[in-house]
């Protein structure tokens, strides 16, 4: 059954040049899990005949039922390459001299946008990515998102065009049209790569190129695939041409004239594009003969391509026969495997250029050098990217990758959570690792130790980590960088147990839920509510189902989904706001003003961040946003959480004792930024200026207890005098549909305050792509509504895109923002009505 044992895999783990860590990424429903099957069956884990239907990596019951991948799953597989293929691996760090075997750690990740946090976790522990694109629908919004994430993490992509069977059987494209489709997809992918990749960077050439063999074509469902390398091998002997030369000739503007045996770069009447003639024609002939049941032709063709049909398959015809023939002529596992082994980097190569992206500490300490050289003798550095639930309720495997050193069963290690700072004790545990295990899709295998460059699971550290963290044996190690998610949790639901006696179980269940999903947030409100926040409707639905069935095991009542809002201001405060401390000895004078457009986004994406050098940051703000240089240098802090899109600027001149109260003012600012004045939602895009401070001369009269609440009152007064506004989150919605259904889409979007900003036809197909902005608040039940209005022909994908100001003034009764504020205040148990300015503003 399986072609290898755990001991063999353990042996391969030391040959780090022959390891490939890769993930499969793509748009939803482009066929990742189906394609993964052909690799898994090549390794002998599942029967070849079942490949394409098994979806081996969809391990959960709801994944099989819904036919979507929800969690990313890992499999380790062992393969051997033939001598003739090994020649293509030129870099000495890409393979050991005498070793033909390769250990491939493959992670199948979900394509659905609601689970893109799972993709981020998968990308962090891998070095290469197989990007799957459906050749009928082309490059979609999610393909772009995941590809962008991959490039940002410095992960090398290779491309696979899936669903060729659809292009031939359903759309019945001509060879030339099909070539143009491929050409367009390759160009689109390369444009995305070029946009996000730094040219001349350490990764070298990242763009994909069919003539180099880094692009594959085929059909995962039927289990066949090829790269230009396979076809060149068939022709190289016959034409007596060098293989690499031929591969270059088979793609692009190369035309061949069979009469005169001449190549040319132009299209004439009697010559034909080489890709169509030598690659597509044979495939078309096989398809044509089999689907039109031409018995004699089939036998001739099979002799030519060297396929013999087994006895039990001899009475098949039509699609069934097509599958058998294509599968034995161009087996998908083989083509994919060669692409992976030849074009994806080994840990030795990849960690050289990924270290600076991964490690927060100095780039020349022991840990950094260990990661850079992928050295199993260096101190252990392992990054845990997610938690995987075990069969034992409430316990988790920590799933991650060893970047340097080796992890051994029973060794003592430092477990550092994401909030750990070197030299402090918080978020740090010294514990023993109970067991190390190997992840195999649906099964796990125990293993003694795992050296650097490999992916594994750990038992016994789940109590000390929430979701992610670093495990190390090096005393002065810093953390590995925290993962950046491309979506943010904006949809929330309040949950409560149906039977109040079950409350402790619910709390316990929420803790486990927070562990098991990289993205979900569980919040305890002060009013005693338990809130679960997720990326979208589907994400929340799956999380609540898990909570009910696996984590808490009790029946649960849930509220309607609620959207998080943000508070902001529209203009500068109309007066200088003054607040006095409770003992009347200290006074603060401040104003609020909105940030210029684009700055909050710059802060979110880290182009302006608190860790920058203040001079470079000030220069950036002055050039791009025309801030005053002296003020831009005196940004005290960002908030909320020290990194959010609001700033506190010191514009005062020569104030005594100012630095002594800085900490207290900052604490008050963080408090106000986290809970705004209108509805206690986070602030966004507000800049507060401190103009003057009068303080008492005795230090005892200006302690934190005097200053912090005063700062908060003063900031609230600033907000109320600066025309407060609410912001709501907006989805970018991409909808695929045939031309007839476009009208129905506009109707649905208009009813839901959405607006279309782009509409394009996918060249070569009858499909239209409509892009629109849709407020998250209006998106509940959108999919069902859309399908009923278009006869089930439209497929939407919604990604969180940006925040936009809700039109209207929340201070005017009966306006929409006013109602939102009232509902939120009621839900949070605050006093009804609007906050009163006189509570916060003092007279001189």
From Swiss-Prot:
* Keyword annotations: Cytoplasm, Elongation factor, GTP-binding, Hydrolase, Nucleotide-binding, Phosphoprotein, Protein biosynthesis
Residues that the record marks as modified (Phosphothreonine) are 57, 59
Residues modified to Phosphoserine: 488
How is this chain modified after translation?
Phosphorylation by EF-2 kinase completely inactivates EF-2.
Query: EC number(s) per UniProt?
Result: 3.6.5.-
- Looking at the record, the residues that make up the tr-type G domain are 17-348
Which Pfam families has this protein been placed in? EFG_C, EFG_III, EFG_IV, GTP_EFTU, GTP_EFTU_D2
Give the source's domain of life in one word: Eukaryota
Q: Which cysteines are joined by disulfide bonds?
A: none
Q: Say what the protein does.
A: Catalyzes the GTP-dependent ribosomal translocation step during translation elongation. During this step, the ribosome changes from the pre-translocational (PRE) to the post-translocational (POST) state as the newly formed A-site-bound peptidyl-tRNA and P-site-bound deacylated tRNA move to the P and E sites, respectively. Catalyzes the coordinated movement of the two tRNA molecules, the mRNA and conformational changes in the ribosome.
Output the PANTHER family linked to this UniProt entry: EUKARYOTIC TRANSLATION ELONGATION FACTOR 2, TRANSLATION ELONGATION FACTOR-RELATED
Protein name listed in UniProt: Translation elongation factor 2
Q: Which gene encodes it?
A: tef2
């Amino acid at each position: 059954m399986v072609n290898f044992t755990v001991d063999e895999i353990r042996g391969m783990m030391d040959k780090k040049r022959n390891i490939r860590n890769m993930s499969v990424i793509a748009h939803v429903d482009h066929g990742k899990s189906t394609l993964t099957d052909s690799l898994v069956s090549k390794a002998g884990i599942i029967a070849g005949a079942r490949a394409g239907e098994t979806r081996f990596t969809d391990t959960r019951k709801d994944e099989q039922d819904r036919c979507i991948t929800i969690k990313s799953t890992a499999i380790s597989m062992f393969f051997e390459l033939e001598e003739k293929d090994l020649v293509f691996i030129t870099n000495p760090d890409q393979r050991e001299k005498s070793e033909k075997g390769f250990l491939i750690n493959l992670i199948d990740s979900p394509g659905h946008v609601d689970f893109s946090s799972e993709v981020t976790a998968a990308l962090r522990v891998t070095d290469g990515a197989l990007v799957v694109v459906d050749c009928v629908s082309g490059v979609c919004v999610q393909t772009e998102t995941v590809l962008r994430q991959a490039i940002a993490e410095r992960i090398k992509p290779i491309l696979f065009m899936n669903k060729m069977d659809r292009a031939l059987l359903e759309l019945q494209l001509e060879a030339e049209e099909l070539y143009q489709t491929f050409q367009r997809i390759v160009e689109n992918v390369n444009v995305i790569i070029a946009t996000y990749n730094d040219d001349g960077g350490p990764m070298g050439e990242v763009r994909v190129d069919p003539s180099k063999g880094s692009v594959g074509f085929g059909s995962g469902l039927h289990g066949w695939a090829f790269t230009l390398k396979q076809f060149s091998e068939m022709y190289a002997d016959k034409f007596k041409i060098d293989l690499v030369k031929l591969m270059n000739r088979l793609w692009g503007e190369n035309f061949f004239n069979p009469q005169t045996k001449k190549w040319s770069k132009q299209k004439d009447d009697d010559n034909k594009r080489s890709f169509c003639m030598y690659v597509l024609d044979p495939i078309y002939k096989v398809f044509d003969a089999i689907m039109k049941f031409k018995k004699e032709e089939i036998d001739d063709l099979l002799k030519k391509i060297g396929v013999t049909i087994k006895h039990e398959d001899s009475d098949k015809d039509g699609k069934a026969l097509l599958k058998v023939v294509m599968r034995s002529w161009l087996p998908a596992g083989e083509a994919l495997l060669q692409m992976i082994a030849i074009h994806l980097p080994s840990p030795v190569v990849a960690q050289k250029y990924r270290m600076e992206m991964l490690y927060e500490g100095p780039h020349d300490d022991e840990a950094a050098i260990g990661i850079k050289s992928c050295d199993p003798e260096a101190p252990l550095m392992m990054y845990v990217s997610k938690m995987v639930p075990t069969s034992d309720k409430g316990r988790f495997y920590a799933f991650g990758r060893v970047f340097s050193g080796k992890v051994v069963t029973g060794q003592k290690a430092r477990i550092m959570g994401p909030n750990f700072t070197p030299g402090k004790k918080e978020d740090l545990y010294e514990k023993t690792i109970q067991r190390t295990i190997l992840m195999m899709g649906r099964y796990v295998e125990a293993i003694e130790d795992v050296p650097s460059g490999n992916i594994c699971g750990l038992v016994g550290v789940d109590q000390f980590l929430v979701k992610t963290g670093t495990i190390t044996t090096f005393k002065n190690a810093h953390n590995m960088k925290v993962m950046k998610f491309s979506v943010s949790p904006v949809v929330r639901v309040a949950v409560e147990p149906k039977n109040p006696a079950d409350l402790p179980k619910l709390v316990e269940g929420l803790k486990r839920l927070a562990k098991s999903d990289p993205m979900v947030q569980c919040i305890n409100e002060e009013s005693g509510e338990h809130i679960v926040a997720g990326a979208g409707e589907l994400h929340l639905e799956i999380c609540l189902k898990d909570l009910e069935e696996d984590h808490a095991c009790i029946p649960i009542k849930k509220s309607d989904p609620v959207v998080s809002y943000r508070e902001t201001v529209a203009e500068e405060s109309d007066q200088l706001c003054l607040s006095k401390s409770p003992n009347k000895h200290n006074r603060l004078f401040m104003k609020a003003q909105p940030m210029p457009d684009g700055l909050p986004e710059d802060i979110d994406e880290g182009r302006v961040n608190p860790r920058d050098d203040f001079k470079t940051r000030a220069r950036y703000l002055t050039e791009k946003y025309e801030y005053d240089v002296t003020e831009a240098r005196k940004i005290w802090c960002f908030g909320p959480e020290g990194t959010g899109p609001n700033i506190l600027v010191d514009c005062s001149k020569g104030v005594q004792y100012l630095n002594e109260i800085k900490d207290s003012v900052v604490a008050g600012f963080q408090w106000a930024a986290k809970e705004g004045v209108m509805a206690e939602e986070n602030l966004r895009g507000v800049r507060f200026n401190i103009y003057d401070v009068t303080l008492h001369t005795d230090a005892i009269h200006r302690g934190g207890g005097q200053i912090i609440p005063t700062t908060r009152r003063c900031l609230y007064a600033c907000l109320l005098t600066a025309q407060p506004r609410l912001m709501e989150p907006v989805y970018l919605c991409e909808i695929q549909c045939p031309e007839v259904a476009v009208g129905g889409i506009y109707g649905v979007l208009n009813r839901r305050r959405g607006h279309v900003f782009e509409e394009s036809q996918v060249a070569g197909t009858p499909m239209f792509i409509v892009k629109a902005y849709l407020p998250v608040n209006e998106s509940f039940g959108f999919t069902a509504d859309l399908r009923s209005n278009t006869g089930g022909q439209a497929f939407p994908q919604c990604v969180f895109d940006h925040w936009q100001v809700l039109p209207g003034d929340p201070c005017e009764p009966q306006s929409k923002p006013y109602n939102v504020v009232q509902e939120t205040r009621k839900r949070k148990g605050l006093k009804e009505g609007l906050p009163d300015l006189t509570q916060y503003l003092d007279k001189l």
